[in-house]
Amino acid sequence: MKSFFTIILVSTITLVQAQFSNEVADSLQKILEAALPPGHVNPGAVMNIYVPGEYNWSGAAGYSVSGTTTGIAAKTAVNTDQFRVGSLTKLMVATSVLLLEETGQLSITDDISLYLRSSLINDTIQSSTGVTIEQLLNHTSGIANAAANQTCQQDALSDLTRFFSLEEAVNCGASQGEEFVPGSSWSYSNTNYTLLAMIIEEVTGQELKTYLQTNIFVPLNLQDTYVPESNELTEDHLGCYWQVGFPFGLVDMSIVNPSLYKGWADVVSTTEDLTRFLEALLGEQIISEVSLSKMEAPNPESSNYGLGMELYTINPDGYQGHSGEVGNTSGLFYSNLSTNLIPNGYYISYNFTYQGASSLVDVDQKVYTYLKDLEASPAGFLEGQEGAQVDVYPNPTSGIINIKTNFNEVLNINLYSTQGQLIKSEILNGKSVNYSGLDNGIYILSITSENQTFTKKITLN
């Protein structure tokens, strides 16, 4: 899917601070509030929408937790609240594996027996043929999901604070028997990422959380992203509540030993940190274009899963990232929607405090539809004068761009490459700008007046 994605990368350290108009911000807030799962006590949610190089919105709804992680949430949620990201962790672990491949420490085509002790391979996993690292990454290993083992699930729910070893987790999956011959089919399995955690630790000699911190979180300045050291989260955060059913009922999973989720769901973060991570990943600032293309290539046995990355389409634009549930519901995606207002797609990240929130219908699709429909009224996209209009022509152009407005204000004109590099900046003194002499290609034209900004994708030829 690499060819579908054009991204402006202004910064992976700080998201730009320009904001949507009040009208758009209010509409996004209403989508978030309407998505709170009904029938629950004090649900909460946070969401971030980021248009690369342009606009950034974060919102919160309902309630979160402060001071203690047990009981019903009572604090008004804010957009900086932290949360357990669930299986979004898989995207980070897969990135780490590909980073290790780039440094020559492993190959994803290697058999896992090169890195794991023989008794674990032969006595516990007992696959009918060899299993590769790549098959762990894309869930074609045939090793069963530990979460599907009812005995192990009840043991975990009975005492969420007890320590779980990686080998226990592997046994919970493998003891169910091989689901299929490795490479012959597809089945989502948390056990695959437990094994990847073991391989990363074997190769690096570091704990997984240390490797993530050193190679991803710190370089990207993700100050609110970490693997917790203790069962409780000390900062303000969203809780985790799962209606499991008999005999447990509603389970408060806010306090949990992080070892239960190691390798597949143990990271804690915020919506803006997650957006920074995905922007950096897709912008090839963590791994190379070659490695990224491997992540984005769906396995033939699954039409929508690559290497630790979910790959969807929404009407018909690409939509890639990952979802997650650990007593809550999370999502982190990039849409390559391309309109005059959103020429380079957008990022969305969110978390809801209850597992099973209808996020695909109530969040992902509704946000996409709303942002796409903004094309019908571009002046409402940003704060500005009512009825403001900007015409840019001809487009494509050989160099001269005419700019016509229905208001009288000084205009600052900035031309960017599709990678976010400023090419030319000037104040419009007449009715046109001249870009003759620049290389042929696609550029982003940003037109800013006193209180509004318009963007337009232009083609020079």
Per-region residue spans from a language model:
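Bacterial Sec-dependent N-terminal signal peptides
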Residues: M1-E23, F381-L382, N395, Q421, ...
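Catalytic loop of the DD-peptidase/beta-lactamase superfamily, centered on the K-T-G motif
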Residues: Q19-Y63, T80, L114, Q213, ...
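Short active-site loop at a secondary-structure junction
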Residues: G39-P43, T68-Q135, F180-S189, K262-G263, ...
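Residue-level signal for well-ordered, solvent-exposed loop/turn and beta-edge residues enriched
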Residues: E54-Y55, Q105, L341, G345-Y346, ...
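Short, surface-exposed loop or secondary-structure junction motifs
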Residues: E54-Y55, Y63-G67, D123-E325
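A short, polar/charged loop-to-alpha-helix boundary motif
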Residues: V65-A77, S359-K366, V433-G437
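C-terminal outer-membrane/trafficking sorting elements
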Residues: G384-N461
